[in-house]
Amino acid sequence: MDHSISPEYNFPAITRCSLSNSLPHRPPSPLPSSADIHRFYNSLSPSAPSVPVSSEMESMEAVEKILNYKFSNKSLLKEAITHTSCTDFPSYERLEFIGDSAIGLAISNYLYLTYPSLEPHDLSLLRAANVSTEKLARVSLNHGLYSFLRRNAPSLDEKVKEFSEAVGKEDDLSVSYGGLVKAPKVLADLFESLAGAVYVDVNFDLQRLWVIFRGLLEPIVTLDDLQKQPQPVSMLFKLCHKHKKRIDIKNWKDGNVSIAVIYLDDELLASGRAENKDIARLIAAKEALRKLSEVFPVEMVIDEDSVEIQLTHAKTKLNEICLKKKWPKPIYSVEEDRSSVQGKRFVCSAKIKITEEKTLYMKGDEQSKIKKAESSSAYHMIRALRKSHYL
């Protein structure tokens, strides 16, 4: 997406604490360029107070231009851009609460319709990547929303500045799992509060909310993005193996919440919490990588044929291949079912009938669960198809 703008564009000054109906249809307003964004964030100082604007209305109108939406209730917009450090007006926390849920549901609907054969596990990973603090913080950063936040917390400026500088140095702008500088939560909170404000202003119309915010969320993280990006858990194991460190990940449930805790040589390193076990592991692994990056270099690379990356999406990928080739869907069968000292072990096979006379068959590796065994057979089927030049 081209984020270039005209040379005369300037960031509006930051608002100090003391801000009719939908806009006619028009193209979205131009975004600030990367240079403009980083010039603004580099000007932030943890010791410098916020600079007042000549008019709160100008600040609010600028936000409306970014959203390409004009609020009927201006108080909602003012509330959405008021941080808790400002005490002269209700803060954005309530709107953030409803915005978080609304954006999550809107993304869920989109993914459900976009990937009709994707399994719930993979849909959860995709949704998490698109509504994570990391993703939404980058959206706020790219659209320059932080400059309009009414705040009285100079320490936030330093965190946002550090994050902005780190993002500016990245080669790949579509980072699905996040970089090594933790995204400031305030950036994601601001985006969610604006989503909540719009959602309330459109009378809780989820479809209208999605129409307004879909463009802001671009590029939306896709299944291919997740497969191509280095996966934090895999990176962590490879990194620790390289430096002869022992890594261990423990998982347990606390009510409906999954908790993942990572130990490095039996010392607590990081933890993560989420509704989904795999997402909790991702959160913990990202935090562990950030901490380890202070000790030794973390290379953001991984073998693209890594089984750990591909197994998660192998069945979905194989379904997509069959659909494209106009083959019937694969048939999975349990070939081996036995018990061992490690518990139950399974081996599954995948079959694809590509013609009346020809059926492709592939067995997978031994796994602890049937679904994983099916994914393993799908993974090996894909590799065999590549080697046999079917793909």
From Swiss-Prot:
Cofactor list: Mg(2+); Mn(2+)
Stretches assigned to the DRBM domain: 218-294, 313-387
EC number from the UniProt entry: 3.1.26.-
Predominant location: nucleus
Enzyme superclass (EC): hydrolase
Gene: RTL2
Protein name: Ribonuclease 3-like protein 2
Localization of this protein: Nucleus; Cytoplasm
Subunit structure, as described in the record: Homodimer; disulfide-linked.
Binding note for cofactor: Binds Mg(2+) or Mn(2+).
Tissue: Expressed in seeds, leaves and flower buds.
Motif Nuclear export signal positions after renumbering to this chain: 7-26
Gene3D superfamilies: 3.30.160.20, Ribonuclease III domain
Positions bearing the site annotation: Important for activity: K185
GO terms (BP aspect): rRNA processing
Sites where the protein binds Mg(2+): E96, D189, E192
Originating species: Arabidopsis thaliana
TM spans (from-to): none
Molecular function GO terms recorded: metal ion binding; ribonuclease III activity; RNA binding
Domain annotation RNase III: ranges: 60-203
Superkingdom assignment: Eukaryota
Pfam families per the UniProt record, alphabetical: DND1_DSRM, dsrm, Ribonuclease_3
Biological role: Ribonuclease that cleaves double-stranded RNA (dsRNA). Required for 3'-external transcribed spacer (ETS) cleavage of the pre-rRNA precursors. May promote the production of 21 nucleotide small interfering RNA (siRNA) during post-transcriptional gene silencing (PTGS).
SMART domains (UniProt xref): DSRM, RIBOc
GO cellular component terms given for this protein: cytoplasm; nucleus
Disulphide linkage map: C240-C322
This protein's UniProt keywords: Cytoplasm, Disulfide bond, Endonuclease, Hydrolase, Magnesium, Manganese, Metal-binding, Nuclease, Nucleus, Repeat, RNA-binding, rRNA processing
